[in-house]
């Protein structure tokens, strides 16, 4: 059984091993694979594992030996799952492996803004505190999270984890969600889209990307938000219109934008957000703690093992 990993570096830059997979077959690992290389590298594979390598219908048709695709991520839009099903190829994903890590990054971004961490660390490097006349130095106030309203778009595993953390900070929590109000904890208020935009001091996006959520945050929705609001996106880049967000930051109608995801990844050097000092951007690393990647690695092997035993799990193209 030949197992080919097409972009192994994404989830394993070298600090993990593949011993669980190696028990299941011959494992060939490529750190990265371009579109021009993917057919040649996968042509003899029974099993292909990938993170961001695209597998469209045309590519799948050129891989007659392929029986299984294991996506090393939760999202599965990199594979044409309909075409895979028609060709008898089982496709699986890894749900919920990064919930804690992404929720943690969400609050790392929020606290970086509300506590002005980057600003004051740089001021210390510039010796502003050392030459200050008082025991403490500050030139701009911090913001307490208690009693502020956190609005959440999407209450899946990550959205709910973020809500639980926010509760410990004493925040008021509202959510725009497809879940019924009766199914939510009493401390989460279900609101409309308009209510979410209007009441949130901090608005955090945790919904899937689809036709309904594409550019959920755009020029029109930004006009309905508080000009003191902080917008956080650790979901998917295209949930926001980045040009509209940059414009709102520039004219002061949005206080800050925190994001671990971008519409184009890696982003263009011409992206307007680079010019905005109140844009706090991290390079799609919220999911990538060692612990999350270790869970991912183990679940990838468990998915492959279940497939080989004839009882596939986490199948996304049933």
Predicted regions and their residues:
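Rossmann-like adenosine-cofactor binding region
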Residues: 55-60, 179-272
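Phosphate-binding beta-alpha-beta segment of Rossmann-like dinucleotide-binding domains, i.e.
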Residues: 87, 95-149, 164, 316
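Gly/Ala-rich phosphate-binding loop of Rossmann-like dinucleotide-binding domains
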Residues: 163, 167, 249
